[in-house]
């Protein structure tokens, strides 16, 4: 089976497990990008602990769920946003989050993967990867 977008598959697995009220989910294959996105989600309080499991192939990630995710997904195409766009939240960016203060956008910047709030504090832009609320 060919996996074209591992981040989209990981986000779909998390949302499906949350909808079924599962206590944990196993994401495979693992990647550094998925681990960095999970780290941001953990810092923001959407998921619990996660651990890498080496299976000798691609690896897996076990994620403990807290039941706080209503919706999550990737943003396709992954387009760039400037710092000023993050502050103003134009209509095309507002469609991913239900409200200004609810949810996070996950952004890949030159300083690493972070939430849009952290990018605003650091005054940097980047490439939109995903949204969670």
From Swiss-Prot:
Q: Which Gene3D superfamilies match?
A: 3.30.1370.30, 3.30.1490.10
Disulfides per UniProt: none
Q: Which family does it belong to?
A: Belongs to the universal ribosomal protein uS8 family.
Protein's UniProt keywords contain Ribosomal protein: yes
Pfam families (alphabetical): Ribosomal_S8
Q: Which PROSITE patterns match?
A: RIBOSOMAL_S8
Q: What does this protein do?
A: One of the primary rRNA binding proteins, it binds directly to 16S rRNA central domain where it helps coordinate assembly of the platform of the 30S subunit.
Q: What is the lineage of its organism?
A: Archaea, Thermoproteota, Thermoprotei, Desulfurococcales, Pyrodictiaceae
Q: Which domain of life is it from?
A: Archaea
Q: Choose any GO biological process term that the UniProt entry carries and state it.
A: translation
Matching entries from InterPro entries are given as: Ribosomal_uS8, Ribosomal_uS8_CS, Ribosomal_uS8_sf
Task: Report the protein name in the record.
Answer: Small ribosomal subunit protein uS8
| Keywords per UniProt | Ribonucleoprotein, Ribosomal protein, RNA-binding, rRNA-binding
Molecular function terms, GO-annotated: rRNA binding; structural constituent of ribosome
The record describes its quaternary structure and partners as: Part of the 30S ribosomal subunit.
Q: Does the keyword Lipid biosynthesis apply?
A: no
Its GO CC terms are:
ribonucleoprotein complex; ribosome
